[in-house]
């Protein structure tokens, strides 16, 4: 019986490359010339530091653009609502969603069951296991998960026939 896992992961290598590209672009941007601005990556958290709040938002936009260039879904980003002001710099923390939260997993399972496809979906920790009789049913579930607006990107792992 074919089965697959629906997971939500961020490719760490591509994330680090996107942060490095953001640093490079920061060094060449005219509007950041002569300003104090920095991008730091540590433990799935990117810290953006700039002289004012507007520049922090520009850094978020640059990071989003670099992530999409590196094929990392920017919807996995969780940006702090308000920049933290300390001294003469503002800093924003950007976290990346890893794993599927139980609430989103329940919504995904309900969405799959409401689609009337002949598959079974079960929550297993931070992933959703889907089994069915036909490979076509699993591919339909993949399309359904991609189209769903649950606020989190999904990847498909462990596809077995």
Curated annotation (Swiss-Prot):
Family, per entry: Belongs to the YajQ family.
SUPFAM superfamilies (UniProt xref): YajQ-like
InterPro entries: DUF520, UPF0234-like_C, UPF0234_N, YajQ-like_sf
An example Gene Ontology CC term for this record: cytosol
Name used for this protein in its record: Nucleotide-binding protein Sbal_0710
Pfam family, any one: DUF520
GO terms assigned for molecular function: nucleotide binding
Keywords, comma-separated and alphabetical: Nucleotide-binding
């Amino acid at each position: 019986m074919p089965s697959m896992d629906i997971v939500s992961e961020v490719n760490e290598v591509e994330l680090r490359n996107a942060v490095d590209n953001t640093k490079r672009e920061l060094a060449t941007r005219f509007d950041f010339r002569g300003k104090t601005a920095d991008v730091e990556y540590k433990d799935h958290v990117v810290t953006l530091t700039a002289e004012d709040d507007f520049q922090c938002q520009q850094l978020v936009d640059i990071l989003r653009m670099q992530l999409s260039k590196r094929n990392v879904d920017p919807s996995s980003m969780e940006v702090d609502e308000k920049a933290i002001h300390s001294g003469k710099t503002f800093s924003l923390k950007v976290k990346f969603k890893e794993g599927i939260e139980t609430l989103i997993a329940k919504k995904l399972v309900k969405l799959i069951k409401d689609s009337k496809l002949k598959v079974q979906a079960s929550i297993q920790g931070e992933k959703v296991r889907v089994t069915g009789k036909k490979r076509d049913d699993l591919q339909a579930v993949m399309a359904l998960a991609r189209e769903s607006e649950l606020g989190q990107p999904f990847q498909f792992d462990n596809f077995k026939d």
